[in-house]
Amino acid sequence: MSEGEKKEKKERRLSLYAKILIAVGCVWAVFFALSFSKSFDDWYVNNIFPLIQGVVARIFNIFPFAAGEIIMYLGAVTLIVTIIWSVVFGIFKLVRRIRRKSAKKSRIYRTYMKVILVIAVCFLWMYLFHWWIPYNGHVMGEPAAEERRGYTIEEYRYVWRLISVKFRDSQKAVPRDENGRIIYPDKKTAYEAVIRSMKNLSERYPRLKGYYGTPKAAKCSDVLDWMGIGGYTYPYTMEITYNKYTSDLYWYVLIAHETAHYKGFYKENEGEFMGMLAAVLSDDPIMVYAGCEDSYYFLSAALMNALVDQYGMKEGLQIFRQFMQEDAELMPDEDLAYRDEMDAYEAAEEAYAADSHPLEQYSDTAAEAADVGWDTQEAVSAENYYDDGTRLFMDYFMGEKAKGTK
């Protein structure tokens, strides 16, 4: 084969590479445009997403560690290497031009950049189909969930009383040792309780059907702890990870929250709502206790805010205290709840203290970065932020009341 034929064949090969990228880019652009239709997004999550999630989650569940976390680290290193190499290569070419020397072509650099481009396209593809389209749909996949109706004081009080009773009863039902401390099961048993509850809710929310992989403790749990992050679901590998220093009591609500993301409910209000709902409706007494503790204080705050808005600070607080007195027999033992919560946090702190943390000197920097991240997430999420989970919780129980069920 002559030199000219080799060159022509090489050009054809490059042309094929470009054509494939262009074709993939066009398909991506079409679905990106479709993603701005919430009806399409809901259809996609209900019909296509479960197939993708089932396959991808099964593949990465094979690994005993969080592959998504490792990929994230490799991605960060690759980005740094790419930036440094590109800057050095650019300076080198500029110097040769200034000296009026022909710039040498780097086959290695060009090949590397082609690979990087393919990787970038793959990630854009996965984030579009694994996260962006599900995230853009209606809240809970239901247009009605976005109506955001207001609730009266009486309605808040109804749900508050309902959860108070569950909270009180679950305090008595949880297994305790001779010192009155809660006896927690291992993570496998606890997660089985989470899965059962999520699957029980699948009649109401069909997206919760299907395959559930095993949550994995994050290697960077200490960093997550400094940043105030309990867990993260990796969209590209469909893996649930959690901060291993999370308290055993809160762990149930956290994993239910992350599992909701795992099933396509990616908005934070959806995750917050599903975390509380799955917990309070669980058949596991510790999980019920965890969910009631979480939702009880959110509902108390919502009820108090409604009273203050209507009657002013002083009178509103007086009425709230009056409600507490009138419903005293329905109320949980808040001192016991506080002790249980502190016991769980102390155990988590002991686990943290038992491990080495070589990056601990950067904990303040991580916390500052987290503050920026939380503020940014709140601005982007807007009305779909965590605090809207209480409104969805109210929607559910008021809907159940209207149907004559609890």
What are these regions (language model features)?
Residues K104-Y135:
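Internal/C-terminal transmembrane anchor helices
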Residues M1-R13, F89-R110:
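Membrane-interfacial, low-structure loops and terminal tails that flank and connect transmembrane helices
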Residues C26-F92:
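Membrane-embedded alpha-helical segments of integral membrane proteins
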Residues W132-E203:
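Membrane-interface segments at or immediately adjacent to transmembrane helices
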Residues Y156-Y158, I163, Y266-M313:
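Post-HExxH zinc-binding segment in Zn-dependent metallohydrolases
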Residues P64, V253-E272, M276-L277:
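Active-site recognition of the HExxH zinc-binding catalytic motif
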